[in-house]
């Protein structure tokens, strides 16, 4: 069984995150989950990361997500005037209150306090949690964790991370009341989150470190400005999970060409332009070797905000999570392959 992994990363993807349940089933069967020390994610990935960090079993996670009516997340006021006022005041059509209550209940069940903080999670000796949010006031992504935000409520961090711009009301947070939205605006797939030496036990797992040219160049500059800080390394103990269409998986994993989509109207143009910008944002921080530590899951063309998921579609997504994870380990464990992220014993 594969037991080299210590860190899990979940990409954002709205309701498509249901597919992670299938992936988690395989990771559990392979003995991977028992060795996970840190978990991070964005948006739907942050929700899955939190549920895992709270200690819910994979079976419990499946029961939770299958029993959830995602339509209830769309908690607008059923009054256009009030919704328009919220859009102008809070920058979102839906309040996000139902989600906050839902996630608060899950936190309370495990930690006894729906307002539990990152520090409380750490005291419970559960896996460390890292949540990505976008601070629109500064224009940069932020990582919420016990390292820098010990007193931040877990529910607030995840509520920020899932706040799809304009779809959900933004969150004002901190002394300055900065405006925060979905972490996916800046960093939807934070696969490099644990690429620092400080996240590796060098005495016990020296093989987990992989030196790369791009990080060596970055460290040369970084160490001049901040000597003594933990250098960047490619962390072989990190495993990521992505939610992509079959065509995108073919491009990223196998370098297959994409089929073009017809652009016959301004709406087509705007949709494709927005998609191209989002694709560039998602890939700009990645390197060619990151796919080797990534499980790709086919999302069956389900949309991020397709909250009206049928039970059949939920099950189909779960099965895709199973298939994608099995395919990954079939490749990873093949002695004829040479994954750069494999720790050789």
Predicted regions located by residue number:
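Gly/Ala-rich beta-loop-alpha elbow adjacent to hydrolase catalytic centers
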Residues: 41, 45
């Amino acid at each position: 069984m594969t037991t080299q992994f210590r860190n899990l990363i979940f990409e954002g993807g709205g309701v498509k995150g249901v597919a992670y349940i299938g992936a988690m089933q395989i990771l559990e069967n392979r003995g991977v989950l028992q060795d996970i020390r840190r978990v991070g994610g964005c948006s739907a990935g942050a929700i899955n990361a939190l549920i895992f960090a709270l200690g819910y079993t994979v079976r419990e996670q499946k029961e939770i997500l299958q029993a959830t009516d995602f339509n209830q997340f769309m908690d607008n006021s059923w009054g256009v005037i009030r919704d328009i006022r919220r859009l102008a005041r809070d920058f979102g059509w839906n309040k996000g209150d139902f989600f906050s209550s839902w996630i608060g209940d899950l936190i309370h069940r495990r930690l006894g306090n729906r307002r539990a903080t990152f520090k409380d999670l750490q005291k419970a000796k559960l896996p460390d949690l890292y949540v990505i949010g976008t601070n629109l006031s500064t224009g940069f992504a932020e990582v919420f964790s016990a390292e820098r935000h010990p007193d931040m409520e877990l529910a607030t961090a995840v509520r920020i991370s899932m706040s799809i711009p304009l779809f959900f009301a933004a969150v004002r947070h901190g002394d300055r009341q900065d405006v925060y939205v979905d972490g996916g605006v800046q960093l939807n797939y934070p696969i490099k989150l644990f690429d620092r030496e400080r996240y590796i036990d060098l005495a016990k797992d020296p093989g987990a470190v992989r030196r790369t040219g791009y990080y060596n160049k970055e460290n040369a500059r970084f160490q001049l400005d901040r000597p003594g800080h933990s250098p960047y390394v490619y962390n072989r103990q990190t495993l990521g999970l992505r939610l992509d269409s079959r065509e995108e998986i073919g491009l990223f994993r196998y370098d297959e060409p994409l089929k073009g989509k017809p652009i016959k109207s301004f709406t087509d143009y705007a949709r494709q332009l927005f998609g191209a910008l989002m694709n560039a944002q998602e890939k700009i921080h990645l390197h060619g070797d990151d796919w080797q530590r990534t499980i790709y899951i086919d999302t069956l063309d389900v949309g991020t905000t397709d909250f009206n998921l049928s039970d059949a579609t939920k099950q189909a997504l779960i099965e895709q999570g199973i298939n994608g994870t099995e395919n990954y380990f079939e490749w990873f464990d093949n002695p004829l392959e040479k994954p750069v992220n494999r720790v050789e014993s």
